[in-house]
Amino acid sequence: PEDSIPFDESIQTVDDINLAVIGIYDTFKSSSLYSGSLTLLPDLQTDLVYGVNGNTNIYGEIWRWKDILATNTSIEGVYAALYNVINRCNFLLDRVDNVRKNTTNDDDLDLIDQCCGEAYFARAIAYSELVKLFCKAYESDEDAANQLGVILTRHYKGNEEMKRASLKDSYQFILDDLDLAAELLALDKDFQPTGKDALYNTAAFFNEY
């Protein structure tokens, strides 16, 4: 678009970083994620959902557990929305050092760290959902090293190879992001313990394997 901001001119201030984090949270409000398909579709596959005569067959293939193709628009929407979250996180993390090097106020530096911690946590959540939905279960380190994981990207504008990593590497990527989030969020004296509980609960889910 003609009014778009070039990458190298974006996120210049601490306020910009804070707004970028708000944008990440806003992306989670997608109708394909927790307020829509990501919550609805698994519920439709439970034993308590029944198809009735005269139904319109909306979500029919999901309910039947068959003929679920990669071109299913609901599933495409979930996949795209999760990577949209990841891209926003990568965008912020790629630009944050430019602001940090020009910031001298300690409170502002702490806020930058907090925002980065939230971005790492958001990226870990998005990748954890992708792994849960599109990968096989983690049986063992040896097996996971030979199973397909998800496409891992650390940068918004990079020359990273767009191919699926191993399941083992995908899990490790998520755990590394959670470790970074825990380290950075711990620096914020106002960070709520309930938020940290959510972080460690996510980490525990992956560490149990």
Can you say where each PLM-predicted feature lies in the sequence?
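Conserved, well-structured interaction surfaces
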Residues: 58-134, 165, 183-188, 192
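Residue register of alpha-helical TPR repeats
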Residues: 118, 125, 198, 204-206
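A structural signal for short, hydrophobic/glycine-enriched beta-strand patches
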Residues: 39-72, 157, 202-209
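Membrane-proximal, proline-rich intrinsically disordered regions
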Residues: 1-45
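Extracytoplasmic/periplasmic, Sec-exported soluble proteins
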Residues: 9-16, 70-85, 111, 144, ...
